[in-house]
A protein has these predicted regions:
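C-terminal beta-strand-rich structural cap/linker in extracellular carbohydrate-active enzymes
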Residues: 426-473
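Boundary/entry segment of secreted carbohydrate-active catalytic domains
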Residues: 33-68
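C-terminal membrane-anchoring or membrane-association module
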Residues: 569-592
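Substrate-binding cleft and catalytic face of glycoside hydrolase catalytic domains
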Residues: 58-78, 82-240
Length: 592
């Protein structure tokens, strides 16, 4: 990453190095952020309890655990397996400041109804359509047991997982019932759980979007909301859910599109609920320490790190309330369900670059009061307003370097790279000039880049309303060619998820008892030429924010001052002073 200004790149003589040092710390050396990050309630990591120390260091604020009926009550309704998710594991998470969210899934073998699905645990439970307080409703009995057991420790409950993963006799399916069957499952869970713990929150199942997209079906969520709207009793019970969860992988731009599709689908029926991005990631294919058995897309470890920051910023701008990365750490048992290495932490406990990128998001994307997507063209800009502090995230969306000018809020800012390294930069004539490295994660099927180039995070003290007010009215404006491209701001979705080769989840949960929860469905890529979904995001579900601070996109080749070179010269200048050398000493060229 490069911080640049509009000066020529020729090195300054030592006679002016000291003046530069006196007015700016642009060339200050990069500093790596250290120490644990306070838990950020916005950001989660699936199964953080498998690496609790790393989770604490990363600032993970919440985690999800699968509470599998088939594993917790393997022998009947009076049985309980305390080793599946031991209480000390839960207690450690809570003590470390991480909220635990329960995922209720997998019908017990003794509770399945007829006909039994190829994956028996995907079968709807017996007695599902009986009243929730009827002893014959086995699902209600389980929900009552588990919510009672964890009351006061687990408050959020997700009801099942990825029911849209269905195609023929696919053994990866986790729900063999209809949309109507799922709605009944949700209603029973809602009524039962609220009776036990009125403060609990019931979440609609996470969906993948791409399974229906691939097979040309109407989106599962659209069909579900149609069913809900047809139930006259639903409004009186707040539609039987408190939040929606979704799972989006690999392609950064689809996060905006899919979240707005969900909003539009809800709003069409008069429903408005919070949205959680409960699974997201772009696992690397080039980690020599974890060569994947299957590869969805060629993703480098650096691109995975870029994805974490971009996905987090864009999800917040789209209106997501919380974001969770799948997942915290690779495990030896992952080979059956996770052919790709999703972990922020490797199996040997070393950190991937994505871990440090997660730290950046957890450290700087806090207390967000308002998030806007201000620029979406060759470059992207997301602004996160935290009241007295403003965080701006920028990245390049094309395959060539781009340089942008960002109107300043303060006289100086902290510039953060995806590695977590920071430096202080100074505004010049009321702007920061930033070089954005090119995007490299090319989608060979759809075209375009799935992930932008390495992002830059600009942190300023001051409200977003002060953007650009520091400009000196007498300053000479920087000359820009009249035909220079200029990024235009937008706060509306500009693209519908395109029906091409997209990650298709292969849901293959196992039923092997284990003291920790096993991963949920993970995506793999399958080429498809299916048509674009007929339901698309509309402006009715977009933020009403007025775009702010559209940066000028400078033409390629604009001279830029390399920060590392500046730091070298600054250090050399200080050395000269300390050595008592004359100011007019002949300039030496830096080592190459």
């Amino acid at each position: 990453m490069h911080v640049t200004d509009c000066r020529q790149s020729r090195r300054p003589p030592l006679t002016i190095v000291f003046a530069v040092l006196a007015i700016t710390v642009l060339g200050a050396p990069l500093v790596a952020a250290q120490g644990p990050i306070p838990p950020n309630p916005i950001f989660g990591a699936v199964e953080s309890y498998d690496a609790p120390d790393a989770a604490t260091l990363a600032g993970v604020g919440w985690t999800r655990v699968q509470l599998r009926w088939a594993e917790l009550q393997p022998n009947g309704p009076d049985d309980w397996n305390p080793f599946f998710f031991p209480d000390p594991v839960l207690d450690r998470e809570l003590a470390d400041g991480r909220e635990v969210v329960g995922l209720l899934i997998n019908t017990a073998t003794w509770a399945v109804s007829e006909p039994i699905a190829p994956n028996g645990f995907a079968t709807p439970p017996e007695g599902l359509y009986l009243p929730y307080d009827d002893p014959g409703n086995l699902w209600a009995n389980f929900v009552r047991t588990v919510v009672t057991r964890y009351k006061g420790r687990i408050r959020h409950w997700i009801v099942w997982n990825e029911p849209d993963v269905q195609h023929g006799d696919d053994l990866g399916l986790v729900w063999a019932g209809s949309v109507e069957d799922y709605y009944q499952l949700l209603k029973v869970a809602y009524l039962t759980a609220k009776e036990v713990d009125p403060a609990c929150q019931i979440h609609l199942t996470g969906t993948t979007y791409w399974w229906d997209h691939k097979y040309g079906r109407e989106q599962w969520l659209k069909r579900f909301f149609d069913v809900v709207a047809a139930d006259p009793a639903a409004p009186a019970h707040d539609y039987y859910f408190d939040a929606v969860t979704t799972h989006i992988y690999f392609k950064v731009h689809t996060i905006w599109d899919i979240i707005h599709f969900i909003k539009t689908s809800m709003n069409a029926h008069g429903i408005d609920k919070p949205i959680w991005l409960a699974e997201t990631n772009a696992p690397p294919s080039n980690d020599p320490a974890a060569v994947p058995a299957e590869v969805s897309f060629d993703i480098t470890q650096g691109e995975q790190a870029a994805f974490i920051i971009q996905a987090s910023a864009l999800a917040l701008a789209a209106g997501a309330e919380r974001i969770e990365v799948y997942k915290m750490v690779d495990k030896s048992s992952d080979s059956d369900t996770d052919p790709e290495p999703f972990g922020l932490v490797r199996q040997d406990s070393s950190y991937r670059p994505a871990f440090h990128a997660y730290q950046v998001a957890a450290r700087y994307f806090r207390d967000v009061r308002r998030a806007t997507r201000d620029v979406w063209g060759e470059t992207a800009q997301v602004t996160l307003s935290e009241g007295s502090r403003t965080v701006t995230v920028l990245w390049n969306r094309v395959g060539e370097p781009r340089t942008v000018r960002l109107a300043a809020i303060a006289a100086q800012a902290t510039l953060v790279e995806q590695s977590g390294e920071t430096r202080t930069i100074a505004a010049r004539n009321g702007t920061y000039t930033l070089a954005l490295d090119p995007a490299t994660a090319w989608d060979p099927h759809q075209g375009g880049h799935m992930i932008g180039g390495p992002p830059l995070v600009v942190v300023e003290n001051g409200p977003v309303s002060a953007r650009g007010t520091r400009r000196n009215p007498t300053a000479t404006p920087t000359a820009t060619p009249t035909d220079a491209p200029r990024v235009t701001a937008t706060a509306t979705p500009t693209a519908t998820p395109t029906a091409t080769d997209t990650p298709t989840p292969t849901a293959t949960p196992t039923n092997t008892p284990t003291p920790t929860a096993t991963a949920t469905a993970t995506p793999t890529a399958t080429p498809t030429d299916t048509p674009t979904p007929t339901v698309t995001p509309t402006a009715t579900a977009t933020p009403t924010a007025t775009p702010i601070s559209t940066p000028t996109l400078l033409p390629p080749g604009t001279d830029a001052l390399h920060p590392t070179g500046d730091a070298l010269w600054a250090a050399l200048g200080i050395g000269v002073v300390l050595a008592g050398l004359r100011i007019g000493l002949r300039q030496r060229q830096p080592p190459t």
